[in-house]
Amino acid sequence: MTSWTEAELPPGAAYRGATVEALKRRRDAEGDKYFPSVFNPGTLSRRGPIRVAEDRIPANKSQDGRPGFNMYYELHGEGPIHLVFLMGLNNSCFGWLDQVDEFGHDPRYSVLVLDNRGYGNTDAPHTRYTTSAFADDVADVFQHLGWTEPRSVHLVGVSMGGMIALEMCRRYSERFASATLLSTTAGDAHNLPPIKGLGMIVLSVSEQIVGAGSPLNRIKRVLDVLFPQEWLDAKSPTDPHGRTNRELVLPVFLWRFNFARR
């Protein structure tokens, strides 16, 4: 079960109108079938987990001794225009909250978000992780949803999600009507992130492996890489209390980290 105990939600932590009480009622009602979600249940049309990669992950490499692994997804809206948003390294699909809120309420769209293998509500098989493997995982979800028509999906990927998107375009090019790539790269031995970003990734992953450090410190480092310092230090133009963007964003990231723990 989750370990989050905050009395109120930080603004922007979950769907518009969400309360701690509503989220807890949903958790209690679903019992053993519960998977943490920040998205609006009012726009939810389908969700996982589903079994994927049964032909690629042998039983001795899965968490439960069966071929493949359980992959979590949520589909919001029921419109004819299909959108999929792919998240980056070590982040859950919760990061697409604003996009799901916006497009999920629009009757023209169906919007798909998912947790990549190894993070969030998705299993972590004991095997090599590659962008081609991630791409095939997403393709399995498409197959499950029936998103197989030519030029029927608009693809969006950020950071590592952009790399997965590029791999999907290479392997399944006929599926996509468009591709939007955010803060990403096509890959190259000499095309590395800035030293600051590399240092953050190495330190954070190392701390998680050995159980050192704190979520708060890791999240602070992530914010310093994701956002410009001048923006973090600036007063938010929409906050009535005059807080900085850092003061508003940090509690959201920390709350989501705690909330996502099952």
PLM feature segments, named:
Residues L23-T127, F142:
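Conserved HGGG/HGGXW glycine-rich cap/lid loop of the alpha/beta-hydrolase fold
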Residues H190, P215-R262:
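Conserved alpha/beta-hydrolase catalytic His-Asp/Glu region
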Residues R66, S110-V156, M160, I164, ...:
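Active-site loop/oxyanion-hole signature of alpha/beta-hydrolase fold enzymes
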Residues M1-F39:
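N-terminal targeting or regulatory segments adjacent to alpha/beta-hydrolase or S9 domains
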Residues F85-G88, S159, T184:
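Glycine-rich His-Gly loop
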